[in-house]
């Protein structure tokens, strides 16, 4: 079982993908985090690819937990958000102040301060364009939808997903429903209606993704799947034929071998192909939204590998010396890097003879996650493996590069402060 609130160890990613049905990531996404397999898995990403290729509306959703520092380990989610925004994605960002209160006891006013000073200013400084940033405690649509979602799940499911026990307080138990509402509310009709939605996450957040995808499927009228042709299953009572007729009318415009069955509430297009599923599902979700306000397309997700902390384990706010904060002073960041663990050998002689182990090295992770020049990063990797590159030189080099980055972000944060009203809507 994965605990999305306190995972501290690295995962066997391939085992996790196999166990929970997470698919391999697409190879044709032109971003260095995807090319290097830092983004290692996905659910439903074919919907996002379809939206990008066909220039139709899609949403990009992420959230921030206002409980500590924004650091390089969670920066890559915003790197993805900015990338998808440039491709046409409509961005929404939730400040999880209710969740931080329920799970970590952080007062709402303190959560607001942390969110703005530690996160949002950095997002803008990184290049995020104006979008919708909101606080859970202020968003009535999210609160209302989380209440409704409670009618579509039960304690047995939440216990199985999260390991909740009778001692967990209700606010904590409700936190996953609030998070699901964060993602799904962007598809309500007053936000533009059903649309493919991508959520960049770490593997530790998969329980949330599974829950919200299941909820989206349960709440829909039309569910589409492939079984040698396209089949549409329609929820409702047998005497309600209108949705069946609508699905039949839609499929008949696109396919020639279409049948409908009122008794079993099924419409089939025998000549429909598997590659037709995504478009069909999107179109029927939009049709369904005309008489079902909860006609959600199950959200897609990208899954990234955890970044190594400078002192081992994953980079986390709970170990300050193990992270590079976006708000770190340049000299402080340099100090942390120079004291970091490495994948190097015990002596310089052994390093030259045996070569280093960059795949185990927190310092190399700084190159891999932060430097977008593929050729250069590959050269660093090969020089380390061959024994040509020494750890001291590597630390000094990346420390200088991180210093330039942090100085630039610091300057842009002050400019960003003047633009906050373009992002935070209350």
Swiss-Prot record:
EC number: 6.1.1.2
GO cellular component, one term: cytoplasm
GO biological process: tryptophanyl-tRNA aminoacylation
First-level EC class: ligase
Record keywords: Aminoacyl-tRNA synthetase, ATP-binding, Cytoplasm, Ligase, Nucleotide-binding, Protein biosynthesis
MF-aspect GO terms: ATP binding; tryptophan-tRNA ligase activity
Motif mapping: 'HIGH' region: 66-74
Primary location recorded for the protein, binned into one broad class: cytoplasm
Signal peptide region: none
Catalyzed chemical reaction(s): tRNA(Trp) + L-tryptophan + ATP = L-tryptophyl-tRNA(Trp) + AMP + diphosphate + H(+)
Short sequence motif 'KMSKS' region: positions: 314-318
InterPro entries cross-referenced by the UniProt entry: aa-tRNA-synth_Ic (IPR002305), Rossmann-like_a/b/a_fold (IPR014729), Trp-tRNA-ligase (IPR002306), Tryptophan-tRNA-ligase_arc (IPR020653)
Cellular localization per UniProt: Cytoplasm
Family recorded in the similarity comment: Belongs to the class-I aminoacyl-tRNA synthetase family.
Protein name (Swiss-Prot/TrEMBL): Tryptophan--tRNA ligase
